[in-house]
């Protein structure tokens, strides 16, 4: 049984509250019964909140585990009295770089909003066997889609120069060469195929001294970005979203590190048909950060699709 009666056609809220949820919803300026694309569905927290505000939602996620959450949401919609859940909610397993094709095939040609919550989800971090978390032991995998080369494959096959370049470019790691040399030396002794072994190799290579966070954090970020081509996918998704949006529609993006945020900032600036809604990105308040430490790094940028000028070709 559900706690509290669900309003007709509105499913119950998710137990896990996403980062900066209310600010995301406000920035999307939801118009009831218009379509919004939740391009990073995850466990469905944003989608449930969007449905509760009256939006219709096309949800996309490449993570194979997301489909079970989508099915649970469909079941909740039926319980809440929606005879045909596809009128309110559609889920497509796909990479958000394929947003244009997905939206066309799903019958959502000009959505009123697109939401991207970037990076690795708490759902992925909480499962040690996915290989995303340096604090949880598991196979060194890191694939969001479950297909293609793993992080263990990269760590096994790349030479020191390639590893150092990835750590420097995608992890913004100051000690990239030192860590890369340590990885090459360690793998000659025994395979680096678990998260705990990689984390220990990086920790041992790191210079002594006070640290704000775990020494392996930037290395794991860099490998995850390479494994999933995250920045290439983001650029593709931003272009597709801006092309798709109806005039007056909103594009809202949550980024968690400077590489992502820079790409979003430049995408908004470089498109004549996008108007940024804030001069600087919005950040989570102290209370939210205290309740959810992941919110500390979040930066929210939002833009509105402008109508074409009259007389424009």
Enumerate the language-model features and the residues they cover.
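S-adenosyl-L-methionine-dependent methyltransferase catalytic core, i.e., the SAM/SAH-binding region
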Residues: 1-313
